[in-house]
Amino acid sequence: MGLGLWIRTGILMTLLTVVLVGIGYLLGGTGGMIIAFTLALFMNLISYWFSDSIVLNWYNARIVSEEEAPELHYIVEKLARQAGIPKPRVAIVPTMVPNAFATGRSPRNAVVAVTEGLLQLLNKDELEGVIAHEISHIKNRDTLIQTIAAVLAGAIMILVDFARWSLWFGAYDDERDSGSVIGLILAIILAPLAATLIQLAISRSREYLADETGARISGKPHALASALMKIEEAVRYRPLRRGNPATAHMFIINPFRGIDFAELFSTHPPTEKRIERLRKIALEMGIIF
């Protein structure tokens, strides 16, 4: 892992730790801050070593063998070879919402996950375009930061839920407790916003890069553009209802569109702009679509 990636990972962990500690202070003063800092250290350790397993478990994703999904394995192996990385493991997510993501702290520990809905929606060329995009995230070492961000942002959201429950069911009788109520309200409002802004900082530019790298790996920018349009339309019609919004930035298209902050603070560039960039890449490759 290069120095630049170590620095980016360290900055991400530090920022999310600060958010966690801030929530802890708002919830419980100095004691809450100490507990939150301890939790942050534990979550940083867990997120580095086990974040891929955590994310896969969130979506009940199942690692599949070549015998179970021969064509999918063939595509992943071919594109990984063209990208010059080890073949990732392959997982299928049991949902009809079409989407895909990659996870893992390094190319040797990586997993490419696709949903059942994606396999049904796309043709072979489009599927290659999507998988090439995910392979590019692995090649560009985005998956470590993306997955750590998902796990730590998930921890932040758990604390926010705790703050919400405390606000609803707590007993606040004197003026001193009014400060606690204000703290809880601030935590509920500001913490998700902070986590989202941090996700934005690591996501948008990397999506453009993965689109470009993936298009050049597969040689089919038009197929990726077509896949993005299909997935975008499907997600708008039927967004993912079960899952962790903290993982939104990991997917090729935000699957939670329409049910949270996603429209105001999108973790992805507009699909139209991504397709326009793919058109330019296609022209460079002598492809018109």
Swiss-Prot record:
InterPro entries given in the database record: HtpX_protease, Pept_M48_protease_HtpX, Peptidase_M48
Residues in coiled coil: none
Details of cofactor binding: Binds 1 zinc ion per subunit.
UniProt GO MF annotations: metalloendopeptidase activity; zinc ion binding
Gene3D superfamilies noted in UniProt: Metalloproteases ('zincins'), catalytic domain
Compartments where located: Cell membrane
Transmembrane segments: 15-35, 36-56, 143-163, 182-202
Keywords, ordered alphabetically: Cell membrane, Hydrolase, Membrane, Metal-binding, Metalloprotease, Protease, Transmembrane, Transmembrane helix, Zinc
Alphabetical list of Pfam families matching this protein: Peptidase_M48
An example Gene Ontology biological process: proteolysis
Protein's UniProt keywords contain Nucleotidyltransferase: no
Active site as annotated: 134
Residues annotated as binding Zn(2+): 133, 137, 207
Keyword hit for Ribosomal protein: no
Family according to the record: Belongs to the peptidase M48B family.
HAMAP family linked to this entry: Pept_M48_protease_HtpX
Entry protein name: Protease HtpX homolog
